[in-house]
Amino acid sequence: MNEYVDKIKKLMEKEMVRYVIAGGMTTAVNLVSFFVLRLVTDLSRSAANIIAIMLAILFAYFANGFYVFRSEQRKSVGRIIREFISFVGMRLFAMVVEVVGTNLLCDSFRYNEFISKIIIQVVVLVINYIFSKCFVFKKDKKPVKDILADNYIMIISFIIPAIFMFVLWVVAEIGPFGGHSLTMVDSLHQYLPFFSDYHDKLVNEGSLFYTWDIGMGSNLLDIIAYYMACPLNFIIVLFSREHLYIAMCLLISIKIALSGMTMASYLGYKCRNKNNLLIIPFAVAYALSNYVIGYSWNLMWMDCILILPLIMQGFEQMMEDGSNYRLYTLSLFYGLLCNYYICFMICVFLVLQFILTNHKNIYKGAEDTLRFAGTSVMAAAMSAFLLIPAYIGLNTTASATRHFPKWEWYGSIWDMIKQMFVLTEPIKSQQFDGGVNLYCGTFAILLIGIYIFNTKIKWYEKLKNVILIVFLMMSFNNTLLNYIWHGFHDQYGIPNRFSFLFIFILLSMGYEAIANTDKKQIPGIALGIIVAFGFLVYADKNIDMDRTVIILTWVLFAVYSAGILVLGLVRGKGRFAVAAILSVLCLTEIVFSAAKGYESNGTVNIPDYYGDAASVQAAIDSVKTGHFPYRTELNNTKVVDESTYYNMQGVSLFGSTVSNDLVNAMHGLGFYTGANEFLFDGANPVSSSVLGIRYLFRRQDEHMSYDMDYVDTVDGVDVYQNSRALKLGFMVNNELKDWTSDASNMFDSINNFVEKSTGVAGTFSQIYPEVTGSSNDITITHDNPYSEYFGLSDILSL
């Protein structure tokens, strides 16, 4: 008997065994609480899930802390609080996985909710063990003050952009400070409505695979993969629909601040000194570059901007130490997961980096090749659950039909270089494909020459980076290279979306140059300064720039040059003081330019677009009776995808994932179409009825564009009904398979559609009214074969 007791005691000494026991008990608390809440109360699945998980978290903290990992028995109050906050924080991530996973299995895969809850526990158990073991109850964990002291440069690099964004919110009256928003251009017309539909699915436990609220019914997984896959986006469930724009602005601001932190991490690794004060201005310059200011309204792109420094840090670690591949794999996985489009550009950049890396010998090169390929494939495989559906969906879009452009130049290369100078207005959208956002600080330009002449930096590193910036500059100005960088896709009004790669290299070169300054480098510094001033003189002759920009650049060059020379001459506290002064000067330039950039960009006043949202929603709700098998639309939208914002089963879709075949079909039915859109504009009685559009909502100050029957007015919004609207599904003749939408005349196309569907011909007929008149010996008669009028026959004959 004692022998069995001893075996049990010995077994219980194993941490994994104790974790399984505690995990089983925690799971029991979770499951029992969930089942009881669902059976006894009227709580929704997600609400019951969250309450059950919170109860399980409280139980798990004590079970893990005092039984499984057996952390110190006597702890200070501060240690307990820190440990508890850390534990809960990590478990909240697992809670998101559990809630979303349970809903996904229930609503998308149609599993029973209790079975779904049990299945997802396996995933949660693994996540919780890793977090608890590696982060929360780590035995050699440093005190908080030591962690802050070791990483204060990274923390400051986060705080400065965060403070800047907070001040911007206040001054520009963003969100709660006045209703303005950073969600401009497509972010207003596409992303906000898509986030509204995503919000509706998360809150109301809808399917994440398909939605009826976008473009007559769309593959929601495609849309999530392109626009909303970032895990941070789950915070939208904490906001109401009318405040989703605030959530999006918050996400943009958080990602900008995180970009500064990740860049600081990379630069600290680059020169093996993460506490160098000079890291801060370069990290902040990355976070507040013109690219970020101009394009941050593409909040899904910002995930790749913030993760790029960590991808490169992991890549360089892996090339130096083949055993260290985790950071590269996980960060690349994050980039591919959050936005495969921008991450494609990062992948091209990584291939160029790998090709230009010094692999020392053929054996090391072979090992590096296998390691680079293997870890990259691993990252892609981890995100394949989104990448594969996204790829299949992309092959149905207009961009799938690739037509390679000729090798041509957009313009002078000096027009590109001009965008590197201070006070350059950031581009937020532009029809000219040669525009580019390159500004990231005047000091970055000055340090190019100093970098090249620095003898402490390896020559092949210099050659690699110079080749990359020259190639990227060529790509900005070349139609074919530009097309390839953009994923074999045209730019559509947002030019050179990969210019953040140029900014990243430029800033990393600049920091490496300034971090390696000493007395021995003074001749190289002086030569680099001479080259920089020579470049400025030559640029002044070739670029049409405002004199204020030229004068300010001269002044900044002079000030920075003096500071860098002094930095190379002094040591100890004197060097720290000079570095502090230089950092403040550089930060002043960056922050001032960022403020001017946001002033130039402006903001969107949300009430101008959604000020009557409550009234429109009331009108929509007045005709809703559960799940209804018909569609509704807005007479005249203020936002392109406005029907999606209201979770209407509408027609319109403006987005990058739109099907090319559907665009062509909608064009044939008379609707307005573009390369990546089809809208309700252009609807006629036949097309409206065929698509099952039963109700139309019109704001009273708008012209009524369609022939429908007035029903009611709800809170200032008129409701119209189309009594001839068909169901969403109906039978047609087999001949419809032969219908093509390429007729030059939409009436001919519609006639052909109806005839092939029903056998009824002549839905629309040509009318040639007699037009005659005379005045001053001039006689007017209708004799123009190109002037055609079409009349609609009785649609009931359908």
PLM features: what roles do these ranges have?
Residues 253-270, 275-360, 371-396, 532-537:
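Membrane-embedded helix bundles of polyisoprenyl
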Residues 221-226, 246-258, 278, 285-309, ...:
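Membrane-interface micro-motifs in multi-pass membrane enzymes
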Residues 238, 547, 577-798:
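Soluble catalytic regions of membrane-associated enzymes that act on cell-envelope
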Residues 342, 463-480, 489-615:
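Contiguous transmembrane helix-bundle modules in multi-pass membrane proteins
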Residues 185, 190, 196-200, 231, ...:
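Periplasmic/ER-lumenal interhelical loops and adjacent helix-loop junctions
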Residues 1-3, 8, 142-174, 371, ...:
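Start-transfer (signal-anchor) and selected internal transmembrane alpha helices
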